[in-house]
Amino acid sequence: MSRLYPERPWIGVLAAVRRGPRCLLARRGEGADAGNWGFIGGQLELGETVLDCAARELLEETAIVAEPRGVLTAFDRIERDAEGRVRFHFTLVTVLLDWQEGEGELCEPQHVTGLGWYTPEEAEAAGIPLSRRALELMRLALGHS
């Protein structure tokens, strides 16, 4: 299924990984968010739970192992073109994970071009371009027990 002008919503899963007072942010290499910093993520596969998807995408893209804790939140991202047609429609489920091991590698550089651990304040102060809702989701993840 094409992500542009799709027939139905595309289900994506974001991995909100926390390590102490920081969350892992990744600079996206492609797609609607290319160049922006946000959470690792990918497409939910048939027969896969959202928790397993978050852990799998994280491991595939960064070689980091983390324990899924549960669903943090879900939201839609819908964009229409000038004629009002749906250009893309993502339903994004954010999963909270606790870091276990791995320092992070750029295993799939076409998808992820940078990695860093940030508090929300550090991310703001760094002046890096952030994905929509990244700070809100970081604060939610870090405030969740």
Residue ranges and their predicted role:
Residues 10-14, 90-94, 112:
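Short hydrophobic/aromatic beta-strand or adjacent loop that forms the aromatic wall/cage
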Residues 19-60, 64:
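Conserved Nudix-box catalytic region and its N-terminal flanking loop in Nudix hydrolases
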Residues 37, 102-145:
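Nudix hydrolase/Nudix homology domain
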Residues 65-74:
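A short coil-to-beta-strand element that immediately follows conserved catalytic motifs
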Residues 76-104:
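Active-site-adjacent beta-strand/loop module that shapes the phosphate/pyrophosphate-binding cleft
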